[in-house]
Design a protein with these regions (language model features):
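Short beta-strand immediately N-terminal to the catalytic nucleophile in serine-hydrolase-like folds
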Residues: 33-35, 60
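Short, solvent-exposed secondary-structure boundary/capping segments
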Residues: 265-268
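Alpha/beta-hydrolase-fold serine-hydrolase catalytic core, especially in secreted/extracellular enzymes
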Residues: 117, 125-256
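Short glycine-enriched nucleophile-adjacent loop
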Residues: 40-51
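Soluble non-cytosolic domains of exported or imported proteins
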Residues: 4-8, 37, 101, 131-134
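Intrinsically disordered, low-complexity, charged/polar segments
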Residues: 282-294
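The feature captures the conserved acid-bearing segment of alpha/beta-hydrolase catalytic domains
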Residues: 55-141
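Alpha/beta-hydrolase active-site loop
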Residues: 2-25, 31-33
């Protein structure tokens, strides 16, 4: 919102970046705003204020446009009567960890209120809040590539009726419960879709819609096995001590005063925020990931 100074800060930042980098086009180049978790509301609001700068929108493990459940925990920004994201391709990715029908409903309602919006949904089944698997990386990359091919530097507004539809997965009204049902109706061109249009989402083309359906078919009926694997009190370790994560095939650093020194081994290190932050200094997050099988 301009009242917060964010818009001015962004514009000054891009001018400064253009000057420092020598790339003058940075002041006008199309942008893909990307936000995660508490910042996942940002991409929608950025596009509403900067539609002529926005190539595509990606809200990752986040929320819907104009949601009442902002990840940062306070009220959303009011867009007013004239702002919208009509024709701007948008991708909302929700992991199974944070899946909640109350997160999806605002997106469905938004599409009814703004029928020219182009919102895709990917249920990142089996995923937690901080992990990002190769399949989802490739999915987001393909989405952005296809948007560029259709919009380019002209940033023409897309017509949703030129895309495809696919239904939304269904879950519980209790946050974090496993997905209860994936869409059974096959994806189809926008005007030929035979499922409920009020519970479906837009996809930029056939390949993207079928890829989404294939992701759902691959996980449908399998058991979700997200579990806490370690609760380590770092106060009992010294700088330089290491610990090993036994579970899973791969382990990744998320945050905290540790660094990865082996395939699944981490070392305690001095932390940028110091040692007197009660929330950050003495705890760390790591993720251990295992590929699914026929049942999980």
């Amino acid at each position: 919102s301009p009242t917060t100074g964010c818009q001015q800060t962004f514009e000054e930042m891009m001018v400064g970046l253009a000057g420092q980098s020598g790339h003058k086009e940075m002041t006008t180049v199309p942008i893909v705003p990307f936000g995660h978790s508490a910042q996942a509301t940002f991409p929608w609001n950025f596009a509403a204020w900067n539609p002529k700068r926005t190539l595509a929108i990606v809200s990752f493990h986040g929320d819907a446009p104009r949601t009442n459940l902002c990840g940062y925990g306070t009220a959303n920004v009011e867009w007013g009567r004239t702002r919208n994201i009509n024709g701007i391709p948008s991708l909302m990715v929700i992991g199974e960890y944070e899946w909640w029908q109350a997160r999806v409903r605002p997106a469905l309602a938004f599409q009814m209120m703004y029928p020219n919006s182009c919102i895709s949904l990917l249920c990142d089944a089996g995923s937690g809040h901080f992990d990002l698997c190769d399949a989802t990386i490739d999915y987001i990359g393909m989405f952005i590539q296809k948007v560029w091919e259709q919009r380019g530097e002209s940033l023409r507004r897309l017509n949703p009726s030129d895309g495809w539809r696919l239904g939304s997965p269904l879950g519980s009204d209790k946050e974090g419960d496993p997905i209860s049902a994936f869409p059974k109706e096959p994806p189809a061109p926008w005007t030929e879709y035979t499922g409920d249009p009020h519970t479906s989402f837009w996809y930029i083309d056939e390949e993207m819609a079928r890829l989404t359906a294939a992701r759902y078919a691959e996980t449908d009926g399998k058991e979700d096995v997200r579990k806490d694997i370690v609760n380590l009190d770092l106060q009992h370790l010294d700088i330089g001590d290491t610990f090993y994560v036994e579970q899973g095939e791969e382990a990744f650093y998320i945050c905290g005063p540790v660094r990865k020194v082996g395939e699944k081994t981490f070392e305690i290190i001095p932390y940028d925020c110091g040692l007197d932050n009660p929330k950050r200094s003495h705890s760390a997050w790591v993720a251990s990931v295992t590929e699914g099988d026929a049942t999980h």
